[in-house]
Swiss-Prot record:
Cytoplasmic-side positions: 1-31, 77-94
Keywords: Apoptosis, Endoplasmic reticulum, Membrane, Transmembrane, Transmembrane helix
Record's keyword annotation contains Nucleotide-binding: no
Coiled coil: none
Record lineage: Eukaryota, Viridiplantae, Streptophyta, Embryophyta, Tracheophyta
Protein name: Dolichyl-diphosphooligosaccharide--protein glycosyltransferase subunit DAD2
Membrane spanning stretches: 32-52, 56-76, 95-115
Main location: endoplasmic reticulum
Amino acid sequence: MVKSTSKDAQDLFHSLHSAYTATPTNLKIIDLYVCFAVFTALIQVAYMALVGSFPFNSFLSGVLSCIGTAVLAVCLRIQVNKENKEFKDLAPERAFADFVLCNLVLHLVIINFLG
């Protein structure tokens, strides 16, 4: 059995970093948006754990809004990525329009859930 060393881990992180630096800027912006949405959901969960979740519908709506938006942004990233062969025929404008429309539907459902 081969033991992994810290050099292997450093090589892995170096190769991941060098591959990510080659990523186009528009995909990096989408990645930043996804990280922000997930971070916001984590802040809401931490707040709920510390303070409580008295209006549970509000807490649930906020977390589901953040996670749903992050999932839709990941779908946008998949569709906009030029190296993805499944969506070669899809224009980036169409993918962004789908993202906006799905976000609108998501937030209408969340507002309806709030009551």
